[in-house]
């Protein structure tokens, strides 16, 4: 492995150690660059008594093993109260309102780059914090700092970090953002880190391995209703609108229908007033397509954002190909976005993130769809 010349001797970095391979290698790379590195493990959720979910204890054990191997200190902090107030209650409120939220984005905004940064600053006297996210930062000659997509396009996590401020990006380091995932695992294996072959965590932390419907049903009462076609024909029942999102194909419980073709059924709309789930056949059903959207709760990394009328690209969901679009400001808090070509399954309540090439500009929340 190529050795890295130490260049940052004395600067203190607190690395968010999750017990996974990305944060493990982040800590190692920063040590190689000459930083004074310490780890901080966050506990963000109080598990059930049987500790079946989230595996926080196992993650802490792995984080400690990595820190011991690297010879660095590991601190722990409990942000469960902050997580409940700022992330989980938002998650429930959005589902209750019939929207589909993204708690990972809110967690990054309120916990990993706010509560964590404040703790690292005030208690641990940090110069920087670091996370195992696949994004990059670029420091420009004019003193500004930009957030860029990660080198590994398949792992790029800029979509989840669009709410970061310019100041937060400037205080954060993202070592693995410069690497492909396979390189990260190779480094971890070469260094003998216990996490080198640990499976990536997926899903929402507080749900763990449980079925989503089972978990959500313990906090929000389900309201069963009808499943209808756009023409109003009742073809089934649902257990609750909150369990379904636009574009969903699996889990609808609709078999072969008389007089219908063989195309699969998709959720194309929700009628909240009537508690009806509307489905149509084919992934490009007209009710599933949007020509644009209005976006509110805007946040720009550089505070100013793109100019009115500009032509850039947008992601309306994670892992989606960028979509070319044109932006028009309705006011300083709201955008009208028109796509070059219609887009399927644009979902109110979800985040959209705007890009200028490799630069993540910021984003907002989908409010209403523009159709026809």
Curated annotation (Swiss-Prot):
Enzyme Commission number, as recorded: 2.8.1.13
One MF annotation (Gene Ontology) recorded for this entry: tRNA binding
Record-annotated disulphide pairs: 107-205
The organism of origin for this protein: Shewanella sp. (strain W3-18-1)
Gene3D superfamilies, per database record: Adenine nucleotide alpha hydrolases-like domains, HUPs, Translation factors
UniProt main location, coarse: cytoplasm
Keywords: ATP-binding, Cytoplasm, Disulfide bond, Nucleotide-binding, RNA-binding, Transferase, tRNA processing, tRNA-binding
GO biological process, one term: tRNA wobble position uridine thiolation
Site note Interaction with tRNA, residues: 133, 350
Cellular compartments annotated: Cytoplasm
Protein name: tRNA-specific 2-thiouridylase MnmA
